[in-house]
Amino acid sequence: MESAFIIEKSVVIVVVFAVTMIMAMYSTWAERKVAAFLQDRVGPNRAGWGGLLQPLADGMKLFSKEEFFPNTPNRFLFVVGPAIAMSTALMTSAVIPWGDRLHLFGKDIILQATDVNIALLYIFGVLSVGVYGIMIGGWASNNKFSLMGAVRAASQMVSYEIAMGLSMIALLMMTGTMSLKVISEQQAGMNWNVFYQPLSFLIFLICSFAETNRTPFDLAECENELIGGYHTEYSSMKMGFYLFAEYASMFISSTIISVLFFGGYNYPGMQWMVDNVGVNTANLLGIAVLFVKICFFIFFYMWVRWTIPRFRYDQLMNLGWRILIPLSIINIMITGAVILRHDIAAALGF
């Protein structure tokens, strides 16, 4: 029994990591296609049909490039930096429910690597470790411009993590759990949390742009300037890891938003599908529905990048500390008042 459980979870973990890598890889292709569409161009169309093999070509190019080490006494940290940035994005996917279950080989297979009752706390803990990957890489590069970019990125991520965490408190007050599986099950049908916590969703969405260093919060790396930010001194696959980590984080952020606020794998009529069509068909459709929601938010990230200009650094900090954090606190107070009123009414029999 234990060996079967270990095999089952190992397969689920491998599949989840593989899907995360593939989605992040093809997000680079989608980014270039969306940019081409908005700029009235064709985009990548040489490697494979419609440029579908372009991510593989980019990976081979990065892999074959020369390894460059700057004049730094911290070679080990120089290598560890991009590894931390990449691994944190992958580790977050372990607690996400990708579907309900599949009935295979006479047993139910849960479509989640692990269901822990502190999943949200785990996600915030892992995401906060990603700051170290950026800071270590910028500091170990022995380049003042890389260090400045790393300090900017770290201060931005830490600042917006506060507002993001506060926005989640209001949601947790309503759901009463940190388990992403339970939160998904509570949103069966169209009972989505975004209808009950629209302000939490808006704050979380804005903070997710800052957490992933996406435009208009990409002050750490200015692509149209000579200095590329904290990864200026990186080349080959180490550079690729930093770039790949951004797209992996974008995919994970889109998944978390879909699960927390838009029902995850749930869709209207899912229980009817289970009763009349079968568990496997209904839950496979649920997986497809989840990925449709994820792709929508990935497209939204890309659309914003090519339509909204970058903030100044003071505007970035003012938005985080003077607007989003106070709004999050007000949202907590409103949510608490509504819950208290509901409890009092229930106690009095109204």
UniProtKB/Swiss-Prot annotation:
It catalyses: a quinone + NADH + 5 H(+)(in) = a quinol + NAD(+) + 4 H(+)(out). The chain crosses the membrane at residues 5-25, 76-96, 118-138, 162-182, 190-210, 243-263, 284-304, 319-339. The keyword Cell inner membrane applies. Its EC number is 7.1.1.-. Keywords: Cell inner membrane, Cell membrane, Membrane, NAD, Quinone, Translocase, Transmembrane, Transmembrane helix, Ubiquinone. It is a multi-pass membrane protein. One of its GO terms (biological process) is aerobic respiration. One of its GO terms (cellular component) is plasma membrane. It is found in: Cell inner membrane. GO terms for molecular function: NADH dehydrogenase activity; oxidoreductase activity, acting on NAD(P)H, quinone or similar compound as acceptor; quinone binding. It comes from the Bacteria. Belongs to the complex I subunit 1 family. NDH-1 is composed of 14 different subunits. Subunits NuoA, H, J, K, L, M, N constitute the membrane sector of the complex. NDH-1 shuttles electrons from NADH, via FMN and iron-sulfur (Fe-S) centers, to quinones in the respiratory chain. The immediate electron acceptor for the enzyme in this species is believed to be ubiquinone. Couples the redox reaction to proton translocation (for every two electrons transferred, four hydrogen ions are translocated across the cytoplasmic membrane), and thus conserves the redox energy in a proton gradient. This subunit may bind ubiquinone. This is NADH-quinone oxidoreductase subunit H.
